[in-house]
Each structure stands twice: as structure tokens, then as C-alpha cells.
Amino acid sequence: MNSLFLLQFACFIFMLINAFIVAVSYLHVRWENKRYERSRWMIVVALLGLAIQYVIQMGFGFRAADDSLGAVVNILVYTPCFSLISMGIYNIEATRSNLRKMIMMCSGIYAAIIAVFCVGIRLHHSLYIREGLYIMLALFCVSVIYCISMIIQEMIRRKNMLETMAATDLLPYVRYSRASVVILWLAVLAMPVAIFSTTLLYIVGPAVLLALLFFNLTFIALGSSYIPTEELLDKEVENDALVGTKYRYGGGTFCQTADLC
């Protein structure tokens, strides 16, 4: 039993424990928020997907056989998992229409990754797809950078809204926001390291796991600090977005004052 197998096994146990903690924390929330709960189960599914990936790596020995072979499997699994985590984060911040746009964009990028993978196998007749690996890595980085930019925009907008309209403690939200961005940036930085050197993975891997743990804890803390007034703000924002859309496309009426309505 070598050190790589032990690292993969530790990551597998870590993902299972974190998925269990995030799922079970549902029993300890004071107020239930449908948007937050959707995000919770997105993150749980993503963590379980990452755990399954480590089982595959241990069972078939892709990473042990070759760094590039293991990296191909990593990208195929990491992309949808990190997209799910990103959408779970974004779901708390954004309106439903914006979330649908993000889902379509992430799905399109992952479809492109699958297409590159299939073309690479067809050309090289093996999982060693050579230059296709770097195209897949580039697409993965594009996906994560896109998610980061969208999340940061919504976080700034929502923080300003909460400061203006809600007299609540913003510290849990600020911690959650920072942890969200940190875990996504580490995803961008860790993937090239995972491709070029398994040795460096022993250093970067624990750092990513600690960041993921901190994110999960701040996510749970955010749910524990939730109060119903925030859900009213969410509904108000969505209603404003819906009214703006109807007015823009002629699907509704626009009133200057309450008396005219």
C-alpha cells in the first residue's frame, strides 16, 4: 500500500464525512429556506461524486499508472462536481433566470470537454489523449473562472442589498462568501499541479481539502444564521427582475406611481 493510495483513501473518507455533515446539518436549521436547501443537496451530490472519483482511482489505478491518465479521469469528474458546487453557491445569490443561464453555460463547457475526450480516444485509440488533455484542462479552467466571475458579481450585489434592506449580522455571509471564492480559486490552481506532478499533489491536496472543509463549515453556519426576512428580500428581488423582464419585452405594464397601478 503506497502513499498515493493512502492519500486517495484519505480524500475518499474526507468527502464522505463532509457530505454526511452537510446533509445532517439539515436537522439543525431554525428556519427552512428552499433556495438554501437546494444548494445544500447540490453540494452533497458534488461531494459524493468526488468520493466516487477516488474509489475509481483506487480501484483502477489510473493515477498510479500515469499522471496524465489520472488527470483525464480527474477532469471528467471534477468538472461536473465543481460546477455543482458553484451552482450551489450561485443559487443562494442569484435569481432563477440567472441560475438557468449558468447551468446552460456550465453544461455547454462540460459537453465540449466530453467531445474533446471522445475525439482524443478516437484519434489515439486509448485514454492517453495527449494534446486533448490540455484542451480539457483549458476548458475546465474556463468553466471555473466563469463561475467565479458570476459568483463574485452576485455576492457584491447581494451584500449591498442586505446592508441596505436587512438589519442582520452579515459576518456569517461574509465568511461564506470569502470561503466560496477561495475554494474555487484553489480548484483552478490545483488542476495544473495534478497534471504535471503527483509529488506536488501531496502538498496542494491537503490545502484544497482544508479549504473545502472551511467552506462547508461556513455554508452550514450561513444556514444556521438564516432568518425569514432574508427570504422576503429574495422574493422581492425576483419579483423586481420579473417585472423588469416583462416591461423590457412588452409582456406587462409599467407604472410610475402606486396610484396609477
Over which residues does each language-model region extend?
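Hydrophobic transmembrane alpha-helical segments in integral membrane proteins
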Residues: M1-A19, L137-C141
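Hydrophobic alpha-helical transmembrane segments of multi-pass membrane proteins
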Residues: A10-H28, R38-G61, L76-S83, G108-V119, ...
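Membrane-water interface of transmembrane alpha-helices
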Residues: N18-S25, C81, I145-K159
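Membrane-interface helix-boundary motifs at transmembrane edges
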Residues: L27-M42, A65-D67, Y90-I103, S126-I129, ...
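The cytoplasmic-loop to transmembrane-helix boundary for the fourth helix
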Residues: Y90-V119, E131-F140, M165-I183
